[in-house]
Structure formats: C-alpha cells, structure tokens
Design a protein with these regions (language model features):
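Catalytic cores of the polymerase beta-like nucleotidyltransferase superfamily
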Residues: 1-189
Length: 189
C-alpha cells in the first residue's frame, strides 16, 4: 500500500478508497479487493503496477469512465475507476447504496485516521445494518442494483430499508433490460 501511496504522491493525485473494500474494512470483515477513485486513474494504475511488477488490466476504456485492475496477488485485486463528477461528493452521489457511497483519502486509510466523506449517511446505515438506496435515480439508472440490494442484505445480514424496497418494487420491470451476463455475474459473487 505504501507503493500505491507513493505512486499517487509522485503524480500529485488525490486518491480515495471507496466502495465495498472500505465498507468491509469498517465492518471488520476480511477484504481481499479494494476499490479506488481519482482523476488520472489510468496513469496511476499503470505506475503502481509497474512499481510492484504486477499486471494491470483495462476493464473499461470509455473516456471519463476508465476502470483498471491491478492484480496485486493471485487472490487480491485493486480496482481503479476515474472519478465521476467534479468532486468526490459528486462521485459518491452516483453510487448505488449509502453503504457503498463513502470515501476515505488513502493517506487517512493507511494511517488509521477517522476523516472520511459520507454525504448520504452510509456509516450510520452500517451501524443500523440497513441497505438504503442513495438519493436520486440510482436504482432506475441501473436496474442490476435491484438484485444487488438483495445480495448485500443476504451476505451482510442487513435489512433493506422500506423506501428502498418500495423503489425496487416500482422499478422491478427494469431488470428485463439488464444483460444476462451481468445478472449471472451478480448472482455468483
């Protein structure tokens, strides 16, 4: 992780730990994969991969949505996604559930500091063991998230918040627009 921090520092990049890895860290659950977001993600992921002499795989090369994976060990990956929006708060607003819409600067994560970005109350929902959709059209925007709510509830032992459950019911027909491969991938995670 120090080599990742050094790579970000060399490139003057503000790097954030986000998503399920951060969530699981705060739940004291084992975590072999970590997700990161920043501006300049392609350059950073490649620099880090070179520094640790591990493969770097491009998962999505769509401009502005680039996602790369560095295979850190045989059973551990670091995924890097281009920051969505102008700020970390704008990025977090586009994520599926409040428990996945939190971010911590890598330096703070490594130092065990407590500062973090949580604009939608994800930490509170972790404590309450709730799956709550982020505000806005996040479930309608990607209907696969309807299934993800149930997967998270089952794997984390959480309850789905009532309004989120109502949204799932309201948007359930949208699942028919999701590619079968994406659904299968979600079901086998």
């Amino acid at each position: 992780m120090k080599k990742l921090e050094d790579s970000a520092s060399d490139l003057e990049i503000s790097l954030y730990v986000v998503g399920g890895g951060l969530r699981n860290h705060w739940l004291d659950k084992p975590c072999t994969d970590l997700d990161f977001t920043c501006r300049g993600v392609t350059q950073l992921a490649r620099r880090f991969a070179e520094r640790i002499r591990r493969p770097c795989i491009t998962l999505d090369d769509t401009p502005g949505r680039e996602t790369l994976r560095v295979v850190v060990h045989k059973d551990s990956n670091f995924d890097f996604t281009e920051l969505q929006g102008k700020t970390i708060e704008e990025d977090l607003a586009q994520r599926d559930f409040t428990i996945n819409a939190m971010a911590q600067p890598l330096s703070g994560f490594l130092a065990g500091r407590t500062e973090y970005h949580d604009p939608h109350g994800g930490r509170r929902d972790l404590e309450k063991r709730l799956i709550r959709a982020n505000p806005g059209p996040v479930l309608r925007a990607d209907p696969l998230r309807l299934l993800r709510a149930f997967r998270f509830a089952a794997t984390l032992g959480f309850e789905i918040e009532a309004d989120t459950l109502a949204q799932i019911t309201r948007f359930k027909e949208g699942i028919n627009r999701v590619a079968v491969e994406r659904i299968l991938h979600e079901l086998i995670l």
